[in-house]
A protein has these predicted regions:
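A residue-level marker of the well-folded mature domains of exported/periplasmic proteins
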Residues: 4, 26-319
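Bacterial N-terminal signal peptides that target proteins for export
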Residues: 1-10
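N-terminal signal peptide c-region/cleavage motif recognized by signal peptidases
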Residues: 21-23
Length: 319
């Protein structure tokens, strides 16, 4: 976690404990809208959980604060919910994790034009000038860390396939950093396809790769849900001993495999859905304390290995 974010987290904690009931919000009702994708896979399920937890904490601490959490099944559905949040709910701030980057950029711009404070989480908009605050994991770092691991473990040469997420800014950041990281090596990228951060699509895409490529040394799945689908495809094809898989996110099932030294999933990379809770809390503190929280706040994405996996394994976690 970078120093600026550490300071911000401290401010959030102090804001919740010391400003609650202080009268800082006595003059007006503050309504924060939170727009997130529906829980269509494990990571977004974690996002919904941490958003609801932040809502409970903040509404208990600040009696004049209301947090409205809405989910969307797609980009167009999310755009429609934004209209309702502004027109019917009359929000003063929007915390949004866009379903996709490009289709949500103009709808969020329209919300901004109404004087609403904009916090963007994770999947960036295509126009960063719209946002007041951006909170995300280190997406270029994920790609860079994964690339270094692949180069080191493969000894600088081998055949790999890549399963991407959705066509979003953060997916491009991860992928571009990964490709840059393997440049100069003899690692050959056989193919790359979108798997929509979904285990079922990960299964289908990997089935296609297995059919077309008789030899694969390793798989970068980029996401733990996708990785689960990939592993299922490998087992069904009886090729699970031929290659290893690296996902990302820090899902407890993936971390447990790393902890157990599963050869098929030797490492993982953290990208926690709890960042949504941080984004909501920081946005709230902006209103109740007047603290300047504009800017970009990037959460580190460390490599999980068998040596440090116990630090990241939480059996009771929803993700």
């Amino acid at each position: 976690m970078n120093p600026r974010l550490k300071t911000l987290v401290t401010c959030v904690s102090l804001g919740i404990t010391s400003l609650a009931g202080s009268g800082a919000m006595a003059q007006e009702k503050i309504k924060i809208g939170v727009s997130i994708p529906s829980a269509d896979h494990g990571w977004t399920g974690g996002v919904d959980f941490f958003a609801q937890e932040a809502k409970k904490r903040l509404e208990a601490a600040y009696k004049n604060l209301e947090v409205v959490v809405v989910t969307a099944t797609g980009a167009s559905d999310q755009a429609n919910t934004l209209e309702d949040l502004v027109a019917a709910q009359k929000i003063k701030a929007l915390v949004i994790l866009p379903y996709e980057s490009a289709p949500l950029t103009d709808p969020v711009r329209q919300v901004k034009s109404k004087g609403v404070f904009i916090t963007v989480v994770d999947r960036a908009l295509t126009d960063s000038n719209i946002q007041d605050l951006y909170v995300a994991g280190d997406n270029p770092g994920m790609g860079k860390i994964a690339a270094k691991y692949f180069v080191d473990k493969l000894g600088g040469k081998g055949d790999i396939v890549v399963l991407r997420g959705l066509p979003t800014v953060i997916d491009n950041q991860r992928y571009d950093a990964f490709i840059e990281g393997i440049k100069g090596s003899q690692i050959k990228l056989l193919d790359q396809k979108y798997a929509n951060w979904n285990r079922d699509d990960g299964f289908k895409v990997m089935q296609d790769f297995l059919t077309r490529f008789p030899h694969i040394d390793a798989v970068w799945a980029q996401d733990d849900d996708i990785a689960i689908g990939v592993l299922d495809a490998l087992r069904q094809a009886h090729r699970e001993k031929e290659m290893w898989v690296v996902g990302g996110g820090g899902m407890k099932q993936a971390v447990k495999r790393v902890l157990d030294k599963d050869a098929a999933t030797p490492v993982d990379i953290i990208y926690s859905p709890s960042m949504i809770g941080l984004a909501i809390e920081v946005t709230a503190v902006h209103f109740v304390s007047g603290l300047p929280v504009n800017g970009r706040y990037i959460v580190d994405s460390p490599l999980i290995t068998p040596e440090n996996a116990s630090q990241y394994y939480f059996p009771t976690s929803p993700y």
